[in-house]
């Protein structure tokens, strides 16, 4: 074999390995394209909430450093996904609050199981994040949502605690003395309950689709819908 032939063979092998790597990354979800992820998600029963509820406020905290890990574990432009039936219920809650001069801001919706594991490792001692050994969070099936109350200008209203903070005061049963906070909690709870959600007792911001409380949906891994996992350093 001549030197030119060997050089050509090496180039061919390198190109083949590169293409195989790209294909593997796409299949495992490490190459992120929000539109493509939304299409794959739809095939598994998930929809982008922004398309179902135009104008709803979304601030996915795990796509920023403002979370218990201190790092973004979702990619930028992460779609805000829920099961289609759950998203329709959320649309009802938004309409109920809109009629009162308020609305919702979503902090988390569908959560890849890969991210759930990272959250448990970072904040497991707080009791906020279910261990995978004990079962998966309903977020991982797209049937749970974390959210808060905003006014018509999109300003967050006073609530018992910040997101993912101070579980000793984060109960759905507010015991503080601030009447405004109490009213805000009750307003949010009433709208979500009327729309078909059940609230997690320990977190005022967490609501589960009541239809699936005793009928959990299959978890959907991020790689299955081309959403890459970004582990904290």
Predicted feature residues:
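Bacterial N-terminal signal peptides
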Residues: 10-20
